[in-house]
Amino acid sequence: MNLDALQQRLGYRFSKPELLQQALTHRSHSAQHNERLEFLGDSVLNCAVADMLYGMFGKLDEGDLSRVRANLVKQQALYEIAQMLQLSDTLRLGEGELKSGGFRRPSILADALEAIVGAVFLDAGFDAARALIRKLYIPILEQVDPRTLGKDAKTLLQEYLQGHKIALPQYNVIATHGAAHSQQFEVECTVPKLEVRVFGTGASRRAAEQAAAKLALDEVQKLVPQLLKRSRAERTGKTRKQPVPQDPQLSLRLKE
């Protein structure tokens, strides 16, 4: 297997290429698979990402740092990075796994990426693994807001309204559709002060509330700046110095 192209995409060349080959080997292919490397890489990845976040975001507290890290190392995030690296083209899978589309499966790709991190750690140590992780994650971190990453729509809406001293939204289930085993919920979300009223649907009440909250947040973020602008204009109008009316008698005396 020629892995030169992958090493070029990684920006790292292995002194022991067999480690990279093992990192790309699924247990369905052979006994020399990547699960132990995956275990090792998971720990290295968590440590390196924590170190990176600690250095980059000095104002985030422990809870926010943990939330951001959890979202950066979860399966979906690893899967997207694996796709960017085109790991599907280099995976070693057993015939059955290959036929069932295992090379596209998020869990297999995410595990392979963690195994690669573990392989780099064994090949050259923690600093080399950390450098690889920074290379992969810095472009992602430059495009996300760490204050909101991983927060659901209901939380974001609540925090936004609280930040502007606006009463919290109200959620009401207004309808359910379908059979008991496949119901669809319809939820209304209102923000009375802003006259926002939107509707969301989902397979559960929670999912419908989240869908409605996302729509409400979009509306609220459009309306609040307008509200603040009007409020400032009104305050400016009230405090603007009014001309003092002249006393006619005083004017006559001055003319004398």
Swiss-Prot record:
> What Enzyme Commission number(s) does the record list for this chain?
3.1.26.3
Q: Which Gene3D superfamilies match?
A: 3.30.160.20, Ribonuclease III domain
Q: Which reaction(s) does the protein catalyse, per the Swiss-Prot or TrEMBL entry?
A: Endonucleolytic cleavage to 5'-phosphomonoester
Q: Where in the cell is it found?
A: Cytoplasm
Q: Which GO terms describe its biological process?
A: mRNA processing; regulation of gene expression; rRNA processing; tRNA processing
Question: Which residues are listed for Mg(2+) binding in this entry?
Answer: E38, D111, E114
Into which EC class is this enzyme placed?
A: hydrolase
Q: Which residues form the RNase III domain?
A: 3-125
GO MF terms, alphabetically ordered: double-stranded RNA binding; metal ion binding; ribonuclease III activity; rRNA binding
Positions of region (Disordered) = 230-256
Span of domain DRBM: 152-222
- Kindly list the cofactors needed: Mg(2+)
- Which SMART domains does the record cross-reference, listed alphabetically? DSRM (SM00358), RIBOc (SM00535)
**One term under GO cellular component:** cytoplasm
A Pfam family that the UniProt record links to this protein: dsrm
Similarity section: Belongs to the ribonuclease III family.
This chain's function reads: Digests double-stranded RNA. Involved in the processing of primary rRNA transcript to yield the immediate precursors to the large and small rRNAs (23S and 16S). Processes some mRNAs, and tRNAs when they are encoded in the rRNA operon. Processes pre-crRNA and tracrRNA of type II CRISPR loci if present in the organism.
Q: How does it assemble?
A: Homodimer.
What is the protein's given name?
A: Ribonuclease 3
